[in-house]
Amino acid sequence: MNCLFCAIVNGDIPSKKVYEDEKCYAFLDIAPQAPVHCLVVPKEHIASANDISEENSAVVAHIFTAIPKIAKALGLVNGYRIVSNIGDDGCQSVKHLHFHILGGEKLSDKMA
């Protein structure tokens, strides 16, 4: 498998790590869309939210318990947005499930 995020998790490609535990890895986005923009990925390869199953759903639940810790460590005390793009029409550029944490300023209310 040739997956960019798997290579980052494995340390084959450098990243600016902000959090890591046994199930997930978070790093700063290389093209930030907000003053603070990081990605949280499961260490296990899951292609997208369409591939979440009974067998791997605990990893996704774990990520959502890690996100508040990551946001706090990034100084996002006034709020943040979590985004996940799914599939081509959803503009998913890397086929490895990931969640964007965006914040650091008042975000536009036009997205959701």
Feature roles, as predicted:
Residues 1-112:
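HIT superfamily nucleotide-processing domains
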